[in-house]
From Swiss-Prot:
Name of this protein: L-aspartate dehydrogenase
Active site (catalytic residues): 224
Source organism per UniProt: Burkholderia pseudomallei (strain K96243)
Family: Belongs to the L-aspartate dehydrogenase family.
Function of the protein: Specifically catalyzes the NAD or NADP-dependent dehydrogenation of L-aspartate to iminoaspartate.
Biochemical pathway: Cofactor biosynthesis; NAD(+) biosynthesis; iminoaspartate from L-aspartate (dehydrogenase route): step 1/1
Length: 271
């Protein structure tokens, strides 16, 4: 059946592993048109070469040929200030994947104020974890406790404070490398903060959400677990996520979450 409506004009912020996967998934979707891609200046030529003249590839919001209807951020924390804030101020609805950055209250306020000023909507993607819809719904009746437990293979914690806690290259048994609030987890482990921050913002907040991070030689994937209780009852959900085929460090579900956000934007019936 032919699409009776004009496609939604989309700007993508970032064209790394997630951005490229999202673009490939919706490239031929009649309800969507990725007409703009915003990337750092040094990446523009390569992205133009990959996408051709049909996409407006620029390095700033000011350089866009026209204002998009919707923007999807999958570029990392810095892009929220540089690109999402001005887009929201201009009235463009945005969905963002870099939730971990929102542990910074000043940034969260800046995004909220920009959305208010532009009359736009900011959507936080669920990313690599499921159950966020249930958790956010349960919050309406009151939550007594929310915990997030994250497990990764030891080498997945290289380059983090975990290196000072244990020998990540020679572990025989699991070891807890962090216990505390979601806010502290985001500050100490910024590259691993998106899931914990998403759980916190959907539930009882960054300070009340308890986080446990574990280096576990028995797992080969990133394992996420949410435990919650409140007026709704109790909930426990665990996910063992696969990476994108062409990028072992990137959750496939994060890309699928972004694809869903785009298709929901173009749909008249949304779940």
């Amino acid at each position: 059946m032919l699409n009776a409506h004009a496609p939604v004009d989309v700007a993508m912020i970032g064209f790394g592993a997630i951005g490229a996967a999202v673009y490939r998934a919706v490239e031929h979707d009649a309800a969507l048109r990725v007409a703009h891609v915003i990337v750092p200046e040094h990446q523009c030529d390569a992205v133009r070469g990959a996408l051709g003249e049909r996409v407006d590839v620029v390095s700033s919001v000011d350089a866009l040929a026209c204002r998009p209807q919707f923007a999807l951020e999958c570029a990392g924390h810095g892009a929220l200030v540089d690109h999402v804030v001005p887009l929201l101020k201009a009235g463009t609805d945005c969905a963002v994947a870099s939730i971990g950055a929102l542990s910074d209250l000043a940034l969260l306020d800046a995004l909220s104020n920009a959305a208010d000023a532009g009359g736009a909507t900011l959507t936080l993607l669920s990313g690599a974890i499921g159950g966020i819809d249930a958790l956010a719904a349960a919050r309406q009746g009151g939550l007594d406790e929310v915990r997030y437990i994250g497990r990764k293979p030891p080498l997945g914690w290289l380059g983090t404070p975990a290196e000072a806690i244990c020998d990540l290259r020679a572990m025989a048994a699991e070891q807890t490398i962090f216990e505390g609030s979601a806010r502290d987890a985001a500050q100490l482990y910024p590259r691993n903060a998106n899931v914990a921050a998403t759980v916190a913002l959907a539930g009882v907040g960054l300070d009340a959400t308890r986080v446990c991070l574990i280096a576990d030689p028995a797992v080969t994937r990133n394992v996420h677990r949410i435990v919650a209780r409140g007026a709704f009852g109790e909930m426990s959900i665990e996910m063992s996520g696969k990476p994108l085929p062409d990028n072992p460090k990137t959750s496939a579900l994060t890309a699928f979450s972004a694809i869903r956000a785009l298709r929901n934007r173009a749909s008249h019936c949304v779940i």
